[in-house]
Amino acid sequence: MQELGSLAAKSAMQDLELEKGDADLLILTSAGHAIVDGQTTQAAIKGLSVESGNSIGDGNLFQVLRPHWKPVWFFFFDRSTGQALYMQAESQSLKKPVEEFKALSQDEAFSKISKANVDIEYLRNHTDDGNITFDQKGFNGNEFSLAGISNVWARGGAFDFIQATCFHDHLCPGVTSGLFLAKYVEEKLPINNISAESYKAIACPNWCKDDLLQMRWDATPGKSGMFVMALTDAEKKAVPGIAGIYIRWNDTAKEGDALALGYNFSAVDLPQWTGPAWGSKLYQDIVLMDYADKPEAFISVIKEFKVDAAMLAQLQNAGMHPLKVAGVM
């Protein structure tokens, strides 16, 4: 499997005309998540690193979450040109002994190799090229995911944010709203005691924001850090813009402070994308980053209140509507 990563990196760097250690190279991959014929694929990451010089520690190699039964693929993006190369492994080739695999050509080792420019400014001016990439699934259905992450990384997206988008498996305005909500809560209800305090999220309603909060706060459902509930259309109308309830909980004192927050995606008059539909959210991903330090532009406080153990149980338990428990609906 290491040889697969090495071959992918070597081939891509030749095609993109990049040298080992080039600071403009980003690598995204499903390796480490994909399992092929019972074989885990994390060793491919070592091959990528050895050949390219990229690493997780340098913030230029990321694993994009995919279910284990999906193919293993590699994506190489050159920030300086916008050019990108997608390579999907040929599953049958991975069954070969190492020496036989080493003898394979690029076309034998990979079932799909596709090159395209995914820089958003290039796509704005060359929509026909974008139509080919997105409409014809140039990256086997991963176009939106890979283009979005690449463009924000290229414009200085923070490591933790990129990592969270990879957990969500793509970048979209919904994930960005999670970053803004997190920053807002952290400013209003800062963690003052790291041994006793943590954040809990009542994700009601749920959307992409909640995956970022799981990563940033370690607020996972399995550890009772997040409780996810949908709202009906009528309930959403009753509390317009409701994003959820966010609690700074002190597990020693068994009490906390809570914010019921609203999020308005249309609160700011952002620059608009005027091209084909595939570019709209990509463009929003980029322009929203200008507000990374101004999350309050999109957020409103619906209610601020105290929480004790009994109320926390009611907010979390099935059969109890958290917005009614909080008194906001």
For each predicted feature, which ranges?
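Non-transmembrane, aqueous-exposed alpha-helical and coiled segments at domain scale
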Residues: 1-171, 180-329
